[in-house]
Amino acid sequence: MNFREELILRCASRRRQKLGQMSDAAYEELLLAVRQNPEAYIDSDAERAFSLLGQAMRKFNESARDDDLLDDDQYMAARNKRFEALRGACQAALSVDADCLDAQLLLTLATVGRPDKLLDALCEIEEKCADEPAFEQLDWGNPWDRARLRLRAAISRTCADCACWKMALETANSVLEVTESAGDPLGARNTAALAYARLEDEEGLNALEARFTQGNAWTSLARCLLLYKLERIPAARRSLRGFAQLNQGAAYAMMRPVFVEVYLPDRPDYAPGCFEEAMAAVHEAEVIIADTPDFVAWCQAQTWFEADARAYAEKHDLDW
């Protein structure tokens, strides 16, 4: 999530609303002015609180840059420290604007660890939004609507973590219906793809993929899992090869899954086909993989797959 860009859009849209009639050309001029110095256009508690969150997340991300150089104890100490700082920043933002939904979301994600407890907490936050416009009336193009969409996307991912697959699919599709025209900025189709795989709904996965011109690590892995679960092994083998070929280090990500930090507040914007995307897809699919007997062993039994994983580890000096 780009907090600064969204702050710019929020400030510009609010100023446009205050000024009344404004042509598109005039709005573009306003947008350029706000982009130069967005802080100068902050004139509401909602914007001030959101700005505080942006500053906090920038510090949070900067503090994690050297994590790879730390041993386990040092890493946990540094992680605990930055999460504590983030929780404090969320509380500060809420003291400015108690209705700041992004602060509520971030605070909950940074505080509640157990997926079942997290799901309850997120659903409780969403219930408080019931008196606002109906969810299907939201618009990603309106920056003030995005917080509710992020919240619903977080609920969908947490449903998947809890193995509540029907609810995960329903909530993911509700987000996708609103955001698909904007290119699915929250990656709702990724959660939906995994849900279709777990529910063994090939028709649903086919229809989902047909809506987009390009697949990704999630859809490739979902396809492979689905075919394996349906015992269509030759087709599953071809899908596994596609997953490995389309995503850097995908075989290594599968064979040596690593810790993936909680998404704050939404899934990072990975470069298509990068190793980080493959890691995230495997991480999000762990609940399905654990519930699919012998899947990892079957992957490992493909000699080319293990060779790919080993070669990637050697090339990038990773543990094997």
Question: Which sequence ranges carry the predicted segments?
Answer:
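Extreme N-terminal leader/anchor segments
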Residues: 1-88, 92-95, 240-243, 306-320
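Flexible helix-coil transition and linker loops at the boundaries of alpha-helical arrays
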Residues: 38-43, 90-97, 121-145, 177-185
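Residue-level recognition of tetratricopeptide repeat
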Residues: 48, 86, 96-103, 182-185, ...
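Long, ordered, amphipathic alpha-helical scaffolds
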Residues: 59, 225-320
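TPR/TPR-like (Sel1-like) alpha-helical repeat modules
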Residues: 119-130, 176-178, 210-217, 227-252
